[in-house]
A protein has these predicted regions:
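Active-site and donor-binding regions of nucleotide-sugar-utilizing enzymes
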Residues: 1-76, 171-173
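N-terminal pre-catalytic "stem/leader" segment of glycosyltransferase-like enzymes
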Residues: 1-14, 104-106, 121-122, 242-243
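Short, charged/polar "capping" segments at the starts of alpha-helices
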Residues: 8-10, 35-36, 57-61, 82, ...
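Hydrophobic/aromatic residues located in beta-strands of well-ordered beta-sheets
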Residues: 25, 50, 123-125, 183
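A donor-sugar binding/catalytic signature common to diverse glycosyltransferases
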Residues: 28-29, 37-39, 61-62, 154-197
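Catalytic binding pocket for nucleotide-activated donors in carbohydrate/polymer assembly enzymes
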Residues: 47, 65-74, 141-142, 171-233
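Conserved catalytic-core segment of nucleotide-activated headgroup transferases in glycan assembly
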Residues: 67, 73-141
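Nucleotide-activated donor-binding/catalytic signature segment of Leloir-type glycosyltransferases, i.e.
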Residues: 136-153
Length: 243
């Protein structure tokens, strides 16, 4: 099943094994890795084999989250097969929810204050699809749009610098990085939101202020390996032939 380490998923696997001890369970961590994926720690009820979408994710899970190396495999990141790089370029993605809008506005201000004139392409602020009519999100977007207008000297239509801006606890940062973009990550709660080189060694991290960090990827394909084989499809085919 698509596996996120949720309690009910572990319960399903655990109860299935009680009924049939020879049953082999599979989980697919179908998202790009989050900054601190503690919910995926290997424990009672974890699947017999977990599929992840990149070698560095496998390395991190085995080193820090207790996964035996023989119980975790890499596979094609099929969730992102239909994603389009253009949908990440020059966009500031607002999260599903937020508490401290001031941190978001201050961090964007800090980043733009430090940017050189005409170094950036103008970007748009995008409200989460579920929150497009939410007044709190609409007001924050308006405030961010005003900040962008205030820093109009920073923008041009000719910059080759491709940037994506994400906010909070989100795996979208990794997706954008794997598309070859730079990522500004605004982290209202840096301890949980920020990617750390302690876990994720292939990300170059530059601090902008206490709540925002600029990322670049040292080598593509380490977290979302679009060149890998779809092992899940192969396993399902083999299991179907046995039945």
């Amino acid at each position: 099943m698509p596996y996120e380490g949720q309690a009910f998923q572990k319960k399903i696997f655990y109860e299935q094994k009680k009924v049939n001890k020879t049953l082999k369970t599979f989980g697919f961590d179908h998202t790009a890795p989050h900054s601190l994926p503690t919910q995926l720690y290997y424990t009672k009820g974890s699947p017999d084999n977990l599929f992840v979408s990149g070698a560095n994710t496998k390395k991190t899970y085995t080193k820090f989250y207790g996964w035996p190396i023989n119980k975790i495999s890499t596979t094609f990141p099929c969730r992102y097969k239909s994603f389009n790089k253009k949908n990440f370029i020059n966009i500031l993605f607002l999260p599903y929810d937020f508490r401290l809008g001031k941190i978001i506005t201050n961090s964007l201000n800090s980043f733009l204050n430090k940017a050189s004139d005409k170094s950036l392409n103008k970007f748009i602020v995008k409200i989460h699809p579920v929150k497009t009519t939410d007044l709190k999100h609409i007001l924050l977007k308006k405030e961010l749009d005003n900040i962008i207008k205030h820093h109009k000297k920073k923008f041009t239509n000719k910059s080759n610098y491709k940037l994506s801006i994400v906010v909070g606890f989100t795996s979208a940062a990794i997706v954008a990085l794997e598309y070859g973009l730079s990522v500004l990550h605004i982290c209202p709660d840096p301890i949980f939101d920020k990617y750390s080189n302690y876990f994720w060694k292939d990300i170059d991290i530059k601090r902008i202020d206490n709540y925002s960090f600029l990322y670049k990827l040292k080598k593509k394909g380490k977290y979302l390996d679009f060149k890998s084989n779809d092992k899940i499809k192969t396993i399902l085919k083999n299991e179907g032939n046995r039945s």
